[in-house]
Amino acid sequence: MKKRFPSTLFLFYRRVTIAISLEGILGWGWLGSLLSKVFAFLVACWNRFSWSTPYRARSTVISVGNIVVGGAGKTPTVLWLAEALRLRGYSCGVLSRGYKSQSSRQKKLTVVDSKVHSASYVGDEPLLMAEKLPEGSVWVHKDRRISAARAAEKFGILLLDDGLQYRKLHKDVEIAVVNGQDPLGGRAFFPKGRLRDFPLRLKTVDAIIVNGGGKEAGTVVKRVSNAPQIFVKPTIASVVWTHNGERIPKEALRELRVGVFCGLGFPQGFLNMLREEGIHILGKYLLPDHAAITKKELNYFCQQMAMRQGQGLLCTEKDSVKLPRLSGEVSLLPIAKVEMRLSVNQDDTLSLLNMIEQIHKNRGN
């Protein structure tokens, strides 16, 4: 008889990966300090000696990136920026490397089609962006010069996802996204902290998006960079049941008793947002960033939440595009995805868009 639940060994493996990726177990003690110093040294060498003339695309390239190992909010920022520019009459293409995807490993240029491609083939974030943006907007290739050259034939503006450390492509505008709850990644390189680049890298960007955290986070960032700051706050746009597409009314969220699973670089921000809406979180099942939950894990977590009288499970949109096929799984609790949007000050938005528009016009595009 086929087992419905994951093995003890697999659950132990999940626990270890979470301890490494989210709890920083590798950063403990003298070994963690040593590994962080080695990583910082390698980054410094890379920054100093790895240099080549960047390819200049025919279109304006806007880079959106960060200095930490995940969880800053790049994908929501790219989606917000693409929509804001669309409302100004600009069509935008998105360039992604497709982190850990089959297409990236095959070095194959892929224009993402959300109806055809899977998260394993193109990557979870490119697939999510393809669902949100007009058809043919998201391009995946490990070498962003190749995707930029092709996408420039169709789009006047290209958004380079996770591009802060990518030097092979010329960037007309650089935007850094920082997590307002930990803007400088614990001030230590991974694994002791969350940095993957030096905070002084923020000095060279054109704008900094402070994702949550408010003015206090802005003050911390101001100590290392005078770049203009734009404060954004992630909020719940809607909560949708995945099995029938029905939206849960906003006023009903405070009555929800659910379990939450997610694979994020900084899951605490997502959990805090749910709690602020009054959602009762009965339990959580955390995954490493970009990891997909398995059918056996869903069965296991659903059983736990059913014993606590849970009404269902919640996950992010990024997790929903990686859900396994669940046809015939009648024992599962219903799953709802949380659709988020960024709340941004209109004056800040206007200032950033005006800067981008001026640079775009100066290029003659």
Curated annotation (Swiss-Prot):
Residues at which ATP binds: 68-75
Pathway(s): Glycolipid biosynthesis; lipid IV(A) biosynthesis; lipid IV(A) from (3R)-3-hydroxytetradecanoyl-[acyl-carrier-protein] and UDP-N-acetyl-alpha-D-glucosamine: step 6/6
Catalytic activity: a lipid A disaccharide + ATP = a lipid IVA + ADP + H(+)
GO molecular function per UniProt: ATP binding; tetraacyldisaccharide 4'-kinase activity
Enzyme class: transferase
Role played: Transfers the gamma-phosphate of ATP to the 4'-position of a tetraacyldisaccharide 1-phosphate intermediate (termed DS-1-P) to form tetraacyldisaccharide 1,4'-bis-phosphate (lipid IVA).
Protein name (database record): Tetraacyldisaccharide 4'-kinase
Keywords: ATP-binding, Kinase, Lipid A biosynthesis, Lipid biosynthesis, Lipid metabolism, Nucleotide-binding, Transferase
InterPro entries the record matches: LpxK, P-loop_NTPase
Biological process, per Gene Ontology: lipid A biosynthetic process; lipopolysaccharide core region biosynthetic process
